[in-house]
Amino acid sequence: MILNNDVKLIPGSKVEAVIRISKKFVKSKYNEILQDYSSRLKVKGFRIGKVPFSIIEGKYSDNIRALTIEKLIHKSLEEFFKSATYKPLGYAVPKILDEKLEIDFSKDFEFTVVYEAYPEFELPDISNVEVEIPEVFVSDSDVEEELKLLQLENAIVVEDSGDVKSGSIVRVDFVELDDSLSEILTTKRQDFVFTVGESNNYYGFDNDIIGMKKDEEKIVEKNYGMDYKFSELANSFKRLKISLKDIKRRDIPKLDDDFAKDIKDSFNTLEDLKEHIRENMLRLVKERSESLKLSKLLSDIAEKLNIEIPSSMFEAEFKNVLNEFSHQNKINLEQLSNSSTGLEGINDVFKENVLKKLKSKLIFQKIVDNDLTEVTDSDLEDELVKQAEDAKMKLADIKKFYQEKNLLEILKDEIKRQKVKDKILKNVKEINPKKVAFRDFINYKTGE
């Protein structure tokens, strides 16, 4: 069908292709559509399927030609992209440049298409790369802190007949009062539950209710400073009526061997649990170190390369980042829409982070594509066995799932990516310029 195509790269990581289709194929496609019209048209004086082509062409020539052009473009692009050196991105629809296309049966049909492709770039040598990663130490205090968190997670909330203390879980009703001590109904709140000393309640009356007992009522007067956390209350006076309806406390379990056994049957002593916590922390350090090492490596490579990110790829990734930011911070996207249109006017921090992230993704994918590592049947079997064990499923059921969903090739690709990642990390030299504590390391930044 396609006689030939002229392809060239143009700025913006775009590809321009001139595609020529043989006039013989154009005529056959036209006749095919004409025949289809003939088989369905009802024309007075003729049976269906017996209408002369000349009559059909006289009435529907423009429609048939337009449909022929549409079919030719669709079919030829499908064929072209299958063997194209520069594959199109899935973020944007290819654009036909020709404003008006017409069929001339005496000539080959030609049109020009422009589409965005993965950017072209050459990878530098990464065989002797050095990456700075801090040396991390897990101390006994880190383990004890984690143990206390586990202790709190397993605490039982029970009724407390005493008075309110810091850490008490209380349920209150409250309302603002005016100068005549009448309730301002628009400020009334009922059954408000919070932990005293750990909340961020609007009026900040945690300390004011310490010592109160269940069913007690109290009027509290509050003067808020200029720097109060909620600006609408800053430099103001409020009078509140607070009714204490319920007091509860956390019954925290004792840290002993029985506590360890309650966490997991395989733990016989508290020391077993502590060792398990330490092992988990060390595993987390290893995973985080590897992630930082790869991130830093890709970031360093990206700084040396001029990679032109396609606009559609940027927009898609930016939208994902924006949605994540909106979800985490509970901000409506409409509030940010004015600053999220294209590359212009976007918050510089967001823009820079998205570009860095995309460059790192593209570099890693290029490394994977260039790597000759193969995924064997044994590799695939090992991964399926591991997933079956982790999910507590039968191996046959895991295999059936991947086969029915046609996901085996995707799984193979993931296995290869992990193999390549392991190979990269093995060859990268790690420099430890400083030591950091476990807690600090969790939020450690490499500067990428």
From Swiss-Prot:
Asked if Cytoplasm is a keyword of the record, the answer is yes
- Tell me which EC number(s) this protein carries: 5.2.1.8
Q: What GO terms describe the biological role, i.e. biological process, of this protein?
A: 'de novo' cotranslational protein folding; cell division; chaperone-mediated protein folding; protein transport; protein unfolding
Compartments, record wording: Cytoplasm
Q: What GO cellular-component annotations does this UniProt entry give?
A: cytoplasm
The UniProt entry, under Gene3D superfamilies, shows: 3.10.50.40, Trigger factor ribosome-binding domain (3.30.70.1050), Trigger factor, C-terminal domain (1.10.3120.10)
Q: Highest taxon of the source?
A: Bacteria
- Which terms are listed as keywords in the entry? Cell cycle, Cell division, Chaperone, Cytoplasm, Isomerase, Rotamase
One MF term in GO for this entry? peptidyl-prolyl cis-trans isomerase activity
Cytoplasm listed as a keyword: yes
Catalysed transformations (reactions): [protein]-peptidylproline (omega=180) = [protein]-peptidylproline (omega=0)
Domain annotation text?
Consists of 3 domains; the N-terminus binds the ribosome, the middle domain has PPIase activity, while the C-terminus has intrinsic chaperone activity on its own.
Q: Please identify the protein, giving its name as recorded.
A: Trigger factor
This protein's species is Borrelia turicatae (strain 91E135)
Upper lineage is: Bacteria, Pseudomonadati, Spirochaetota, Spirochaetia, Spirochaetales
Gene field: tig
